[in-house]
Amino acid sequence: VGSEMCIRDRLETALCLCANGVKVYLFDALRPTPELSFAVRHLHCNIGVNITASHNPKEYNGYKVYWDDGAQIVSPQDKEIIAEVNNIEDFSMVKTMDKDAAIDAGLLNVIGQEIDDAYIGELHKLVMNPEEIQKAGDLKIVYSPLHGTGLKPVTRVLSELGFKDVHVVEEQAVQDGNFPTVKSPNPEGAEAYALSLELAKKVGGELILVTDPDADRLGMYGYDSKNNEYKEFTGNMFGAILCDYVLMQRAQSGRLPDNPAIVTTVVITNMVKEICKKYNTFCDCNNLIGFKNIASRMRAYEQTGEHNYVFGLEDTFGCLPGTYARDKDSVGTLMLLCEAAAYYKNRGMTLWDRMVELWQEYGYYKEKVQTMKFDGREGAAKIQSMIQTLRDNPVQKVGTYSVEKIYDYKLGTETDAATGKSEAAVLPKSNMIYYQLADGAWFLVRPSGTEPKIKFYLGVKGTVSYTHLRAHETRGNLV
């Protein structure tokens, strides 16, 4: 059992489990979510629980449950657990016990430094070019934990690897669940970078990195030396850079396994697919949104031996660079980004320069998510009506792009837009519709699984300026 902020809730959860005869390992202090995922595997636990608000505003809280492989639960476990919760008719039915009694009974076991050491040790194994880090140890890194749990593991692993010029945003280094310096500590929002950008300009930072409060997601800005400005990286962008870097380094050193696979989701940038082709690596991308679905594929590989997992990523700023855990890990991701930055610095380049090179090699890809929110029961009904309308009345165009094929993940069908002919397709079950568009573009619509929102995802490809303009034009037409 661990938590990102809520100390009391962590202990209450542990004592409830102890009262039901369950042996519990309880972290002695706040820890990152990926470390809990690692600990479940390391300690051979049956389940893990993390109490966290994650990147949400301070009013929110969450209860993440992990299975014995360290992955967040999927069906049927999720439905079975919530059914038990709904069976509670009165809070007096919930058992608890005294902390000292639980310790004396051998049910409550406090863990800490030994798990930290084992976790950091696994991250060290991921480093591919330690000599590159030593040559560029003066890389100026600006880092903010956004009042969360990333501070200790991030600064520790960077220091141990030899990065000597790390500048922490002190105002955001204090763990505080009220997140006093930001409205929402979300790496996807520009607000989260205000203090980091200010510090970077002051110290001449080359790389700006932030982790969300439970340290599973990462955000990044990189320095553009040609224009003397900082550029924002989306999750798709730094995910593509890492896919390219990891596959390139492993291929060059002979460390790429047989039948390698990059695992991602259906809304990832198509650039990742092109990078995988270059390195003869399977891009496992027909997966539902959410990192638990990536973890599910990792488990399948272990059972079948069909592929060997190399790297996993999703568009929402989450990556897992190894098999030591089963949830996205900003600490390991940040570490590899810093290694890649050192590698390119030794060649007179920044990560922004490398991003431009990737665009020049594979084409300019741009992705965007548009969200519409509808509150209450009427809002929920409106969302379902919107997606059903799209299902019942197939569109021929999305903005200025012609529709070529329509994949309905709820019905399990593939439809040719020109002929209207449909046939069965092997698709994971979900209430979403994917449109394959002309010119390498795509569009997906789905209701959010956690909020009263409907989400529209768009990906386009082309020349830099032309694609940028068409992307904005299409988003406007969608809304």
Residue ranges and their predicted role:
Residues 1-9, 467-474:
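Conserved small/polar residues in nucleotide/adenosyl-binding loops
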Residues 8-12, 37-41, 59-65, 152-157, ...:
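Short acidic, glycine/serine/threonine-rich loops at helix termini
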Residues 8-60, 164-219:
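N-terminal small/polar loop signature for handling phosphorylated ligands or for N-terminal nucleophile
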Residues 61-194, 198-200:
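Gly/Ser/Thr-enriched, mixed-charge loops and adjacent short helices
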Residues 206-207, 229-231, 249-446, 453, ...:
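Phosphate-binding and adjacent anionic-ligand microenvironments
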Residues 454, 458-470, 475, 479:
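Generic C-terminus detector
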